[in-house]
Design a protein with these regions (language model features):
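N-terminal metal-binding scaffold of metallo-dependent hydrolase/deaminase domains
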Residues: 1-47
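Divalent metal-dependent hydrolysis catalytic cores, especially in the metallo-beta-lactamase
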Residues: 87-140, 155-171, 190-205, 224-227
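Conserved small/polar residues in nucleotide/adenosyl-binding loops
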Residues: 293-300
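Active-site core of metal-dependent hydrolases
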Residues: 169, 183-290
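Divalent metal-coordination and catalytic microenvironments
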Residues: 15, 33, 57, 68, ...
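Short amphipathic alpha-helices and their capping/turn segments at secondary-structure boundaries
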Residues: 50-51, 55-56, 147-152, 264-276
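Hydrophobic "anchor" residues on beta-strands that sit immediately upstream
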Residues: 9-10, 62-64, 197, 281
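Metal-associated gating/positioning segment near the N- to mid-region
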Residues: 45, 50, 55-118
Length: 300
């Protein structure tokens, strides 16, 4: 006799399904953690020992991807007490996030790519999909192997590199350092079958995206491999970001930045500009500690 309970059948009934296209009201049958059937009406007795969950009036969709999360914590820019803790699995899954990319921020002194790699692997063992970027704000990049190219090529969870530009907390990298870093990430991606992307933390400097354009003029890394994030932190930067997307680049809007360009306003501007939505992503910047640099202090 077949033991159906071993398969762990679960039937989700009556949800409004987006997959991500609108599928209307559907039932979803799951076995061993995998979807095996989607239909308008799946009988609850289709298999014995099936757990039925009534989702009438609820929305069901694939898990969200958050590509900018400080998995081992962030902050520290106003002293040790402003360091934030690492992310618990439940904080991600309760928000519907099932795929995540971890990275470092300003602090790559007391936080390290090696620790981020361990956290990333732990989340994968706990059941979600997790990757990471090597590097941090600083250029040359803090890495695990001593090379951005090697990190991306041979470390399973590393898919690219991060740095900061147009920000007083950056290392003020010149175009040649940026070009070398982006080229290493690109080649590492080719060798490792990875995206090989370079993510640029954008600050509030009037230079805005100019360092990225300078990079494009001085190396042959495709614009599709360069991803500026936090582009909605000020209006001039967002205007430049729209132009960057028109040229074929991808931009990342930070959902935790409410002004001056709120995420909803940002996506409306993208649509009005006729930019393909495939060139825009949203991420949370989760667990980062945010400071307002508005007045002089002993730390200035």
């Amino acid at each position: 006799m077949i033991d159906y309970s071993a398969a762990g059948f679960t039937l989700l009934q009556g949800a409004h399904l987006y997959a991500p296209e609108d599928r209307g009201i559907c039932d979803v049958l799951i076995a061993n953690g995998k979807i095996i059937a989607v239909a308008s009406n799946i009988p609850s007795d289709i298999v014995p020992d099936c757990t039925v969950v009534d989702l009438s009036g609820q929305i069901l969709c694939p898990g969200f991807i958050d590509q900018h999360v400080h998995l081992i914590g962030g902050g520290g820019e106003a002293g040790p007490t402003t360091r934030t803790p690492e992310v618990a699995l439940s904080r991600l899954t309760e928000a519907g996030v099932t795929s995540v990319v971890g990275l470092l921020g300003t602090d790559s002194i007391s936080r390290h790519p090696e620790s981020l790699l361990a956290k990333t692997r732990a989340l994968n063992e706990e059941g979600i999909s997790a990757w990471m970027l090597t590097g941090a704000y600083h250029v040359p990049s803090r890495t695990i192997t001593g090379s951005v190219e090697k990190d991306v090529a041979i470390i399973d969870r590393v898919i690219g590199v991060k740095c900061a530009i147009s920000d007083h907390r950056s290392a003020a990298p010149d175009v040649y350092h940026l070009a070398n870093m982006a080229a290493e990430s690109r080649v590492g991606g080719l060798l490792g079958g990875k995206p090989g992307v370079t993510v640029f933390h954008m600050g509030d400097s009037k230079k805005a995206l100019q360092p990225v354009y300078d990079l494009l003029e001085n190396c042959d890394v495709p614009i599709s491999k360069l991803l500026p994030t936090h582009v909605n932190r000020n209006v001039p930067l967002f205007e430049q970001a729209l132009e960057f997307a028109r040229k074929g680049g991808t931009i990342d809007i930070t959902s935790s930045i409410d002004e001056p360009v709120a995420p909803a306003e940002g996506i409306a501007r993208v649509v009005q500009a006729g930019i393909p939505l495939a060139r825009v992503t949203f991420s949370s910047k989760h667990t980062q500690h945010c400071l307002l640099y508005t007045s002089p202090s002993p730390r200035d």
